[in-house]
Each structure stands twice: as C-alpha cells, then as structure tokens.
C-alpha cells in the first residue's frame, strides 16, 4: 500500500472531501438502478421481478441516504469505534425504510458502501493513495475480525438462514474480504469492456454478469433455492463466453435472460449491490486520484 507525506490541505478539506464522496456514492447507486437490461432488477422502464418496487421508489431511497456516506467517511477519518459505524448504518436503514414505506431497497448498499466510505475516510487520515486496492486493504485490516466474529447477526434474516440451511456466504463475508469479488471479478470485466467500447453502461452490464457468474447470491437462493443459483451462474457464464456485451446481438441475448428471470421471479440483488460497490470504487479512484 502506497503512503505519502502528510499534507496540511487534506486536513483542512476533509469535510469537503466527505461531501464529494457522499455524492459519488449516491451517484453510483443511481447509475446502478438506472442501468437497463439487468435481469430481474428494477430500472427506469421495468420493475423486473419486483412487484413492490419501481424506479421512483429507488430514487426516493437514494435521496434518503443524503449525508449518510459523508458521515461514514468522517467516522473513518476520526477512527470512531466499530459499533459507532454500525449504529450510523442502522440509523440510515431506518431513514431508508421510512422513505420507502418499509420496503428494503438499499439495506445492502448501506452496509457495503458504509464500510467502504469509512475506509476512504481512514485512507484520507493516513494519507494513503486512494484506489480500489487500498480501500479493500483498509477494510480488511481495520474491521475484518469484528465483521466476522462480533457483528450481531439476526437469525431470522434471509442471509443468516441461507448460511444455516445451505452453508453459503453472504454480504458480511464479502465486506470482510474487502470486496474480493469486486476487485477480482467485477472491476477487471468493467475496465476491459470500457477500454474496448468507451461505453460505461455496457461495461457495467458486463461487470454485473461477471458478478452473477461467480457470486453465491443469497437473493437468488432465497427465491429459487440452490438449483436456481446454479442456473443463474451458468446462464451468466454462457453469456460471457459468447462475448457478453461485445456480441453484435448482445441486447437480444440479454433479453432472453431477462425473460427467464422474470418468469421465474428471480432477482440477483446481491450482484446488483456489488455492482454499486464497483462503480463507487472506480469513481473514488478517479475523483481523488491527485488529492494526496
């Protein structure tokens, strides 16, 4: 991890940096939900497999999170306790649920990007060059043990029930790993397609399918069992093997996957959450490239 000499302006500007980070996080969430052709997921033109959600609901949800990521960035900068970071996230969940009338739109994003934002704050405090790798390492070094061993888990949550019933991991383990799946899978696929096409939307969709091909998505298992997970992973792998969004007829190919997901009421919500993390990390690296 690269460190550099302290700069006084960084300490003077931390509040401004945290505000910019907050906007980046909310923009990443907005771009994720705005992306079309996500199988089973909400976008501006479809509810996907969700009868209780639409694009306007997600917009209200994102608006309710204004200042949350700023606060978590400052929490990381000031090295507050793990429990304080967690309580900040719980309050954001309550605000989100109030805005959506108790529909869970962004619980995963609050958890994922909350710790990612706090990690950015700690990188600011230690004058560490900001990129996806340094954010990942900061999460692992600072909170991995507490995430894996001390975070209270609700035995009735669908994630915990998936762990107990099927032995699959979920969001807690992914965050504790420093978003290993994001770094190893999503970011490389995104960068490859963006370098070839210059199209951020196609790059994002390719990253989503890459995540779907690898992730043990508890949202899929919750709705369709392990058999559905294997089918989803295989469909995503086959799409990528055919060239993914580089195919001449890629939209027709994706539409077949979309139809299957809606018919079987499947929604890769875990992969969507990690696409949001992917976009956030790329935005942070670009925005703060020359800040240290």
UniProtKB/Swiss-Prot annotation:
This is Probable 2-(5''-triphosphoribosyl)-3'-dephosphocoenzyme-A synthase. GO terms for molecular function: ATP binding; triphosphoribosyl-dephospho-CoA synthase activity. The lineage of its organism: Bacteria, Pseudomonadati, Pseudomonadota, Gammaproteobacteria, Moraxellales. It comes from the Bacteria. Belongs to the CitG/MdcB family. InterPro entries: CitG, TriPribosyl-deP-CoA_syn. It comes from Acinetobacter calcoaceticus. GO terms for biological process: prosthetic group biosynthetic process. PANTHER family: 2-(5''-TRIPHOSPHORIBOSYL)-3'-DEPHOSPHOCOENZYME-A SYNTHASE, TRIPHOSPHORIBOSYL-DEPHOSPHO-COA SYNTHASE. The gene is mdcB. Involved in the formation of 2-(5''-phosphoribosyl)-3'-dephosphocoenzyme-A, the prosthetic group of the acyl-carrier protein of the malonate decarboxylase.
